[in-house]
Amino acid sequence: MTYDVVPAFGGRARLDTAFTVALREVVARVPGARGAVFLDGDGEAVDEFAEVPTTEIRILGAHLGILVSLVKEHAGQLGEPLELVIETDRATLLVLVLDDRYLVALEAGPEAQLGVMRRELERAATALRREMR
């Protein structure tokens, strides 16, 4: 895993990991994307990249982690959830389950195309899984 120090939102320096790079790339490749967050199974942010303050994407990630946990708990005979999509009049949220311990989520404006979000978040998920080994 490589590390670089780069300016974060608000001008403060932060340590840039391979996880950050994957998240930054997905945000850059999806028109309208606002941020992406890599989460553990409890909804705690492992890493994030956002065009908005990172606190917002971390809080959103925590809430999405809780939703995925609830879906897993109540899915029963339907099987394990693979993704969660929430569309509102102001945002589209996509969460992919990476494995039994990790998730990745992408937030975008309503203009973002879900198919593009899914394709690019899958690319990021592949990079994240590779780095997790």
What do these predicted regions represent?
Residues 1-133:
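Non-catalytic interaction/Regulatory regions outside core domains
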